[in-house]
């Protein structure tokens, strides 16, 4: 089973950017731990981060025929990007939306997601553990639903 983890804008700054909200762990440490979890579950996890919407759209397109599931923390693009939504729907690969912070406990403009209504599930508010919970949920979903 091949899974793709997508991280959007500013997530490359984890560990430096607003640690009170996003935690002190780096994206690299989150990805390393998640790869280990995926391997233990019999899956391969590929990670990709970009601050550019078009690069994320292109990487989603490249997942056709290669990835069985997608984990996506689109960052601020969650609340603005119809392009990411259309790309995810276009490839028809099951995906889980995830966030480090509870977006519903933050500013009102963060309450709207263009991705959530078509996602297998949404995990938010558990810090770095959101990634692990999203991975577990996606793997379980794929095993149950082929």
From Swiss-Prot:
Binding-site list for substrate: 73, 79, 86, 100-101, 110
Enzyme class label: lyase
Catalytic activity entry: 3-dehydroquinate = 3-dehydroshikimate + H2O
GO molecular function: 3-dehydroquinate dehydratase activity
UniProt keyword Ribosomal protein present: no
UniProt site (Transition state stabilizer): 17
Pathway(s) served: Metabolic intermediate biosynthesis; chorismate biosynthesis; chorismate from D-erythrose 4-phosphate and phosphoenolpyruvate: step 3/7
Keywords: Amino-acid biosynthesis, Aromatic amino acid biosynthesis, Lyase
Span of the signal peptide: none
PANTHER family recorded: CATABOLIC 3-DEHYDROQUINASE
Family indicated by similarity: Belongs to the type-II 3-dehydroquinase family.
HAMAP family: AroQ (MF_00169)
Functional summary from the UniProt entry: Catalyzes a trans-dehydration via an enolate intermediate.
Protein name: 3-dehydroquinate dehydratase
Native species: Parasynechococcus marenigrum (strain WH8102)
Lineage: Bacteria, Bacillati, Cyanobacteriota, Cyanophyceae, Synechococcales
């Amino acid at each position: 089973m091949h899974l793709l983890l997508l991280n959007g804008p500013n997530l490359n700054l984890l560990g430096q950017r607003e640690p009170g909200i996003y935690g002190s762990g780096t994206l690299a440490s989150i990805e390393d731990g998640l790869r280990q979890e995926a391997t233990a579950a019999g899956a391969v996890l590929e990670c990709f981060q970009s601050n550019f919407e078009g690069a994320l759209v292109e990487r989603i397109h490249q997942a056709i025929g290669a990835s069985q599931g997608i984990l996506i923390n689109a960052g601020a693009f969650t609340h603005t990007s119809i392009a990411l939504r259309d790309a995810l729907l276009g490839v028809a690969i099951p995906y889980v939306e995830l966030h480090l912070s509870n977006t519903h406990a933050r500013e009102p403009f963060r309450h709207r997601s263009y991705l959530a209504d078509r996602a297998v599930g949404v995990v938010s508010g558990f810090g770095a553990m959101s990634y692990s919970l999203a991975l577990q949920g996606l793997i379980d979903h794929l095993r149950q639903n082929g």
